[in-house]
Amino acid sequence: MPVSSRASPSRILWAAAFVLTLAASAPAVAKEVTVTIQNFAFTPANATLAAGDTVTFVNGDDMVHSIVADDGSFHSDGLDTGDKVSFPFAKGGTFGYHCGLHPFMKGQIVVK
């Protein structure tokens, strides 16, 4: 008796349901947002990201800078030219920050 190589409709439906279940349960990939410090400013000054994402600050200035959260939840030591520091954001919220050495330098991170 010949064997059919054609998939039955029920097999196709089960396979589709399986693939959709895998896709729906796959964890989101965390993203890294880079904020550059240059000319006494953060670029971008305002960043929006998802919970689980990381913000990396890179000092492109020829001056030492530091990162300080307005609410004290994170801070860095002084960053020399080319130095970088990363902060993961696990939960939602709005986080204002500034340079600890130059308080007029400000930014905001919104975590959704």
Name the predicted role of every residue range.
Residues P2-R11, A15-L20, S25-K112:
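Extracytoplasmic copper-binding redox domains, predominantly the cupredoxin/blue-copper superfamily
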